[in-house]
Amino acid sequence: GQAESTLNVLNIDEETKKLLDAEIICTMFEGNAPYRPRYVIPNYEVLMEKGCKFLDLDVPTDIWEATNNLLILYKHVPSITSYPVYLGNIDTLLEPFVKDEEEAYKAIKLYLKHIDRSLTDSFVHANIGPVDTKAGRLILKAMKELECAMPNLTVKYDKDITSKEFIELCASTALVTAKPSFANHKMDVE
């Protein structure tokens, strides 16, 4: 931003200045003093377990309150892009609230549509897996139906945990929507 560029808070040596001027080093047009962090990874589980006093959000009791609380909190995550980069392990966040699958599907579909229409940044990302959940299956069903660009979605695959049926559902969804991406969860947690 232009306002941040009026400040010269970084001690940049002459060699680095030349590289910046030659556009060999990219600042991503954030200015000299970005006033918001780039990557913030909120603990969304705390929101689900305790609510948020600051935003006057009670602990969610159903799928509608759970998706609504997440959508509200997403608008308050400080980020240089003005969007949250990470949306959480959305299947495990929503799984406790899947009581009626038809009702949950409607809520999850609207939740995903809202994300696609309002968090329009390619860095917006969510995870599902490695455990096969009803919420995860409903998320995949909605992603396949909506074919939304956002959020980017990754399935955390673990050959010892992830069911064959769930990973096949992920693969069939990816053939339609180019997501989820597949991550080796076991490698990530070791």
Where are the regions that the model predicts?
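Conserved catalytic cores of very large enzyme subunits
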Residues: G1-E190
